[in-house]
Amino acid sequence: MMNQDNPYAMNQTCKVCGEPAAGFHFGAFTCEGCKSFFGRSYNNLSSISDCKNNGECIINKKNRTACKACRLKKCLMVGMSKSGSRYGRRSNWFKIHCLLQEQQQQAVAAMAAHHNSQQAGGGSSGGSGGGQGMPNGVKGMSGVPPPAAAAAALGMLGHPGGYPGLYAVANAGGSSRSKEELMMLGLDGSVEYGSHKHPVVASPSVSSPDSHNSDSSVEVSSVRGNPLLHLGGKSNSGGSSSGADGSHSGGGGGGGGGVTPGRPPQMRKDLSPFLPLPFPGLASMPVMPPPAFLPPSHLLFPGYHPALYSHHQGLLKPTPEQQQAAVAAAAVQHLFNSSGAGQRFAPGTSPFANHQQHHKEEDQPAPARSPSTHANNNHLLTNGGAADELTKRFYLDAVLKSQQQSPPPTTKLPPHSKQDYSISALVTPNSESGRERVKSRQNEEDDEARADGIIDGAEHDDEEEDLVVSMTPPHSPAQQEERTPAGEDPRPSPGQDNPIDLSMKTTGSSLSSKSSSPEIEPETEISSDVEKNDTDDDDEDLKVTPEEEISVRETADPEIEEDHSSTTETAKTSIENTHNNNNSISNNNNNNNNNNNSILSDSEASETIKRKLDELIEASSENGKRLRLEAPVKVATSNALDLTTKV
């Protein structure tokens, strides 16, 4: 027969006679003989005589032709109906689908019936009406089958518990039938076994086409179960394959009454839970959370963090640099105010260098910051990176010049006294110079902003600023600011405002001073190196005894009259030098350079700096100690009164 040609047909058997099914015909898997019989007899009921055996004839391959009445009855019970023929020559899947769709007639289960009725459709009509030979019996039978089909459809939809009534009806229908009827319909295995073990599938199995294996419907159905499962999974295209789908979905056990229904339902159950759960769960959980988290993650990590990191880097870097620049500005202001070196000496060189070294002495970590401070200070100063080398050279040259040339007399001891009673400040950290350093540290940022202005304005009013600073040696930056405008332009005032900042932000101020004066920047780098060497010397300088301070004062007394401002700067520088030997040398040189710069122009100072770069390096070691002593001497001279008080 045809089913031999069709591999799926081999898996499926005729629901009526048990032969291999040729395909899904009239809503059930049937062989060609039963298909043609039903087609002929359905329209010619008059030709069919009543059963002589009270309708108890067994329809099988051998005796299927013995009783037309029983054969037609079984065809109807299997679910065959003339309505199934109106689909014409269509695929088995399509026929099953359409049949189940009609039987269910429920919009809710329509789509479910389409997919599920493909498998359950064949049996849905035949399941309940098996007892009646009337063609209407098929429809009448649908009373239970539609629920069964609907249940199957729902099971496919993944709502096995959605319609318990349907399952109950299917189970009730299956269980209500006698064992014999179930055997006749093949529902005993499909309904009872399937419905009890797999209620979702059980209901479809009621109408399953396989239900009518009169001889051994259960056995056949159980054997067919696997094919049904395979067919159902593969969505059979062949006549029998669609029948398998029909049995798989419709009753899952219509064809595979015992084993098959259970398996299809399991598959259905698996599909049903997975489909609804994964889609809502996956869609909602993975889909929703990712959108929810992704925007924040992007905003936070890429958006905020990069921005924050970049901002923080920019802010943090500028902050130390700005603080250092402010410290440098304060140092410049103090230097200018104390010694008027800004006017005499290049505004960016000696004053800044002194404060840079001073701050370096106080804050040795500044050398690490120095590169960034150089960059920021370069921005502050037009010289930029190129000025670094020039600044170093100029700074060192200024230091050498200041050392070689005695600082020009400048009566500005009070400014230095407030800024640096270098030795006393070092010896007595609570001294005004220490306070000023703290203030300078506090006002590093202000000093940076003011450092540039201080450099410019300090050159003009360094002497006045020095006087003002001398008036208020250890005062808060605000006082220094007030003094600065009084003595100088408000630009130098930031430098004055940050005497504390200088002490607090020694490294930052030195770096900022580097930035404030590009020429000083290279010097600051050199001084940073010197600072490392001077760190040891700083301790020695700090260890200077009051006697040394007094002796320095005595020696510095004449110098005080000569150049209180320069000596105060030298004292500050000496404090810085005490912190750093080389820095102290460079600071003393810077103080001398401040004096020399006041005498010499900026160009001359730069030239002398270039000349004395090597000398500074050579004399750095020797001058480190001398400058330590000299710096205290200068400090004492510049701040003799304050030094005495502080000693």
UniProtKB/Swiss-Prot annotation:
InterPro entries: Nuclear_hormone_rcpt_NR3, Znf_hrmn_rcpt, Znf_NHR/GATA. It is found in: Nucleus. Residues 11-87 bind DNA. Its main location: nucleus. A zinc finger (NR C4-type) spans 14-34, 51-75. Residues 433-443, 480-491, 542-556 have a biased composition (Basic and acidic residues). The keyword Transport does not apply. This is Knirps-related protein.
